[in-house]
Design a protein with these regions (language model features):
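Active-site loop-to-helix "anion-binding N-cap" substructures in soluble metabolic enzymes
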Residues: 1-232, 238-305
Length: 305
């Protein structure tokens, strides 16, 4: 079967089996095309909480599927590709952060959504890159322990100088590998292009950007801008989606290093096989984990508006 035929089979199966498909924006175009909802982590979290179907199929990474299960515990949630983890989410665990909390008892723990369900159970609030500044700004606490991404934490701290931040050494290895030298090379090659970067990038890269924002923020900025040429400083799929959506504009990836192997692990055939019952993985979380982890996600949605 070709791509179009597989997509049609998927559309038939998801209707037949009452499945809602969620796809992160870093997924390949052919996967996003068959999804009911696409977007960044924050949007997908909100979407997951409103799903009416009996089943949810996540095309993304494990923590995203766990978040779906936490927000919709009565649904059966599947991860299309079981091997799709997140290197950032695996950097810190509940035991480690419990020890850090003892060192800083007067600090509120703000967890990037790129964390495991188990770790979320001891955090005060979750944030995404699109909601972090707003949420932390709305928190009454002045002292913030921000985990795990130190680059995003640095970005948020600079927007909110009235708060005290403690950052740990964690982050996205894909975004963090981008350097100021990469930026200089790209700007020299495309001198008329605006640079749009994700706050998971190093501060030295963020400081050189024309716009800093989440994946959704970057896409909205580029689509609505009067400018016609952009350098995209986040996962390569965003540049590809933008080029498809805005054929009259030019999009260049900042560096070819911006490819997330975990996000690219999911294929259209994985989605098809999961719907057939021949692949994927059902996400199972115990009731206590769901109850405890849901508190910080609910707080994210409440403070994020």
């Amino acid at each position: 079967m070709n791509i179009s035929e597989i997509q049609n089979k998927i559309l038939e199966l998801k209707k037949e089996k009452d499945v809602c498909i969620l796809a992160h924006s870093y997924q390949a175009r052919e996967i996003c095309e068959i999804a009911d909802f696409t977007g960044d982590s924050y949007k997908l979290s909100v979407d997951a909480s409103k799903v009416t179907n009996k089943n949810i199929l996540m095309c993304g990474v494990r923590f995203m599927a766990e978040t779906c299960k936490i927000l919709s515990p009565d649904k059966t949630v599947y991860l299309a590709q079981p091997s799709a983890g997140c290197q950032m989410a695996d950097q810190m665990d509940k035991e480690m952060i419990s020890s850090v909390k003892e060192m800083y008892p007067d600090y509120a723990v703000v967890a990037y959504i790129n964390t495991t369900a188990d770790l979320k159970t001891i955090c005060d609030v979750c944030v995404t890159s699109s909601s972090a500044v707003k949420i932390v700004s709305n928190m009454p606490e002045k002292n913030i322990l921000f985990i795990p991404d130190c680059n995003l934490g640095d970005y948020v701290s600079r927007q909110l100088p009235n708060k005290n931040f403690k950052l740990l050494h964690g982050g996205c290895p894909i975004h963090a590998c981008v350097t100021a030298e990469d930026v200089k090379k790209a700007k020299a090659q495309f001198p008329n292009a605006e640079l749009l970067v994700h706050p998971e990038c190093q501060p030295a890269v963020v400081d050189l950007a024309d716009y800093v924002g989440s994946t959704s923020g970057i896409m909205n900025y580029a689509k609505n801008s009067d400018k016609k040429e952009f350098i995209i400083g986040t996962e390569i799929s965003i540049a590809e989606h933008l080029q498809y959506d805005c054929p009259d504009k030019k999009f260049h990836i900042l560096t070819q290093k911006l490819i997330c192997p975990n996000m690219k692990a999911t294929t259209l055939m994985d989605v098809f096989n999961c719907l057939k019952g021949e692949g994927g993985e059902e996400i199972i979380l115990d009731e206590q984990t769901i109850t405890d982890a849901k508190k910080c996600i609910d707080e994210m949605i409440r403070l994020g508006g």
